């Protein structure tokens, strides 16, 4: 009632509202009657999860299909459990979060079990690599066993997958992915150059020369054919991790299997659900565990979605309870009296009923008056 004392406040609620019926329940106020109080309608509802698969949503087509197939639950899913197409785990910020049950979320669950424990990680190293291989953020590979050419090709394979949209840098997912590739190329040039001292002029000082990474690698191999067979120097193995840790958009792969493997995996791990380059099974998807049940078909126009919610509320208006001042007074459990909340004295008299605007009451031992 304190909220309703302010005429400049609009009361909007959200979270778990996946169906028009649930929305109508809130807009008409029926929801509160289940708790033994008068109808308490809200002014607006917030639709989130239910709109994730609409035509206007930027989620990929396969993700929309999976959302429509996900049954959802009526309550919470405990951490690490899998129920009705949903699971629960930890986000990259160590907060509880719900995921759709798929290969990506199962990999996340595995990493939750070993996060921060180097011994446990190494004991399950093969299992972890296998789980990551089925996700959009695979293990990069054992860099210490790679040649320079293999390193560069693997990096380009995983990072140069951009479609050139306004958030990307040409074929690169981000400008910092381009600059990291430049760092790796120049490190290779320096390592394989015949001169051991002095400045070495790089062929790749201009970032525009990296618009096509395959061409850049071909140019490097023409200058330094030894890159095909030369295995990475131990110092360059460490340098690769330094490059991966540089500020900017996190790398789209797991560069090393260590105690921080969960952080590597969870960092920047949600955009893939909007990229058609990846299948829905490979990406983390985070709908509300209850509201996801309201998604019945992919690519429904959002206007039609809103119309369904609107119609359900309008259809319920004729039967929605009308709360009068008298209703509120007689059913209130407490009243404000003398600056304090006190038990409603009217409820001590007996049980009240309102018929045709007239109040009658029944005491415990007397008939209606």
For the regions a language model picked out, list residue spans one by one.
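Alpha-helix-loop-beta-strand connector modules within alpha/beta enzyme cores
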Residues: 1-14, 18, 22
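Conserved active-site-proximal phosphate/metal-binding subdomains
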Residues: 2-8, 27-369
